[in-house]
Amino acid sequence: IAVSRRDIGDAQVGDCVAVEVTSYGDDTYHPQGVVSAALGENGTMEASIAAILHENGVFDVFPDEVLKQADAIPQQVDLASAGKRLDLRDKLIFTIDGDDAKDFDDAVSLEKLDNGHYLLGVHIADVSHYVTPDSPLDSEAFRRGTSVYFPGHVVPMLPFALSNGICSLNPNVDRLAFSALMEMDASGRRYGARFSKSIIRSKARMTYNKVNKILAGDKGLREEYAFLVETAEKMNDLAHALYKRRIERGALELDIPEAEIRVDEAGKPVEICFRERGESEKLIEEFMLQANEAVA
């Protein structure tokens, strides 16, 4: 495609660009076009990601009206406008995510009841409190549909002020959530469930790696997180019971290895390996399944 010098915009020699065809030419002329976007120096990680996003209609930049609405949302919970909610801030609730996770949208809890049963809690960030129907944020989230993840890079469905801020269940701060509270015995049998808008305060930002090491007996981590070790062990026991019950019911288990692309500090891929799936990953999987089954 031939592009005139006057139609290259801000692009530089060696850049990766997107070109809009203005004429497809004929037997004697090449197609003609104009540079519609300069995506960065060709061959770099940034340009490669930008090209994939552009090709698939995914936009890294949010419209001004969306950012304006997001920036106007306070980064602290306003109890006066939160409405009637179940106050769970004194409960031992914590998140478990990957080492590189920046947004924490779910948390878990487990407590022993007087009748010997357990109360399993799955707490999901209440984004709907901040993203109201037909607002600019709502329309943009609907248009995007999902967050798009690359190794070392994410294009969020919602601006970072929400996804990494007030809608992220960060530790030691109040957050609005929607909680599924399920009563079950040690064998994983569920006796009932209730659902409520809630306010929580996560007590720790845990990672799969740390919880796996705690469950494996890592002395240093067990001392550092002594306040949740017993709960983590009981969670693991319950997760095993839930898995056993699920398999006995005829669940189809597709334990397919997941590839993990590791990048260096510059964001360049340096290794492709199988993602390890330890006890904590399975624990979260079982608890989320329980919450979904209870809701259904």
Residue map of PLM features:
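Short hinge/gating elements
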Residues: 1-5, 23, 37, 220-225, ...
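Conserved phosphate/anionic-ligand binding catalytic regions in large, soluble enzymes, centered on
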Residues: 118-131, 282-293
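Conserved catalytic alpha/beta cores of large enzymes that bind or transform nucleotide phosphates
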Residues: 147-248
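Core structural elements
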Residues: 246-270, 286-294
